[in-house]
Amino acid sequence: MKSTETTYKKDNMGLTPSQIVNELNRFIVGQDKAKKAVAIALRNRYRRKRVEGNLRNEIVPKNILMIGSTGVGKTEIARRLAKLTNSPFYKIEATKFTEVGYVGRDVESIIRDLVEIAVNTEKALAKIAVDINAREKAIERILDSLVGKTSSSETREKFKAKVLNGELDDTEIEISVADTTPVGGGGFEIPCIPGASMGVLNLGDMIGRALGNSKTKTKKMLIKDAMTVIIPEESEKLIDQEKIIQKAINLAENDGIVFIDEIDKIASTSNAGAKNAEISREGVQRDLLPLIEGTTVNTKYGPVKTDHILFIASGAFHIAKPSDLLPELQGRLPIRVELNLLTKDDMIKILLEPETSLIKQYSALIGTEEVHLEFTDAAIEKIADYAITVNLEVEDIGARRLHTILENLLEDISFEASEMKVKKIIIDDKFVENQLSKIITNLDLAKFVL
């Protein structure tokens, strides 16, 4: 069956704003203003790359502040945008950080983690490019162990054919592989001085690099298992690590997207509690300022400039207001988008319309047991009704409420599906009511169950 997922390529960076919105519409319901804002931000990156001369360096991304309750699509919009363009994407909650000088994570770890993601992305692409050569070299190593290095070419070809067609998968061989056990156990980490740019150093990594990481050990394993170990080893030898790091840093600097959630939780409010907490929250905001405006962060891969990284901050702002953020931080998030609360119609669309909708997901899961689920329109409407009711009466968690409702609705079917003789189940409004009405009408119970 042909996959409905888009093949995400870097070429997608050249998509027009309307094309970007259309792609987002495949997975996300509503929130047109937010989609439009991120589509323009992404297109401006493409435009900037086409600007010639020194002016290109002066054009910086217009960072975005998304305002909206949980479960309305803030994170999903940013995540899908990054996936669409294969951009390094890093999501973090603002509450995870402490002010420089205090124990805890400092904000510069955002960039270190973003670069790590970029390096892993580039390394995966490089391994795909050398996969054929790596596989050939892996087979040669297995043949050395199987028939010896001095065996004739005829013998090697004969056994190579058997390895390739899987005849020898369960044959045990003795082969030398890289010893991946970290030096000294690898569990000893040295925290740097608070606020230092390098974060945490692993002593095992440092010693391993000093020794050249060339330690090997002989292991007995089946040929099919040996292939899964040796191919990555050979790939590592074939790829240019320095080139990968350079490309990864460039990718992070020019295409990276950082999503900072719960930024409202570090805003100072007039009715806030302890004064020390206020100072700490304001300190985190001040630490974020240079990062968002543009600075250079030292990482284990080298210095990384943040000038052209797109920052998307978000928060519900139920208690604090955007104006409670430091004025300097507000100025560095010039584009503000308010996301709408989800209506009953939105809930129905979320259940049905996206390519990876919840109904399709649950139907596919139960379908693996050869049980076909069929939802009537009345059932979908009833599920949406219950989701809105519980969100209003208990706590509004947006579309995430649909997950808990569907889990409770289909609990018995999920448990019994593997042993069911019935191969088709129709979920109608009566079924939904029978399964959920007792929970919905008892709000005290709903608080715990839904």
Curated annotation (Swiss-Prot):
Belongs to the ClpX chaperone family. HslU subfamily. Its main location: cytoplasm. GO terms for molecular function: ATP binding; ATP hydrolysis activity; DNA binding; peptidase activity; proteasome-activating activity. GO terms for cellular component: HslUV protease complex. The keyword Chaperone applies. PANTHER family: ATP-DEPENDENT CLP PROTEASE ATP-BINDING SUBUNIT CLPX-LIKE, MITOCHONDRIAL-RELATED, ATP-DEPENDENT PROTEASE ATPASE SUBUNIT HSLU. It holds the Pfam family MCM. The keyword Chaperone applies. This is ATP-dependent protease ATPase subunit HslU. A double ring-shaped homohexamer of HslV is capped on each side by a ring-shaped HslU homohexamer. The assembly of the HslU/HslV complex is dependent on binding of ATP. Keywords: ATP-binding, Chaperone, Cytoplasm, Nucleotide-binding. ATPase subunit of a proteasome-like degradation complex; this subunit has chaperone activity. The binding of ATP and its subsequent hydrolysis by HslU are essential for unfolding of protein substrates subsequently hydrolyzed by HslV. HslU recognizes the N-terminal part of its protein substrates and unfolds these before they are guided to HslV for hydrolysis. The gene is hslU. SUPFAM superfamilies: P-loop containing nucleoside triphosphate hydrolases (SSF52540). CDD domains: RecA-like_HslU. It is found in: Cytoplasm. ATP binds at residues 29, 71-76, 261, 328, 400. One of its GO terms (biological process) is proteolysis involved in protein catabolic process.
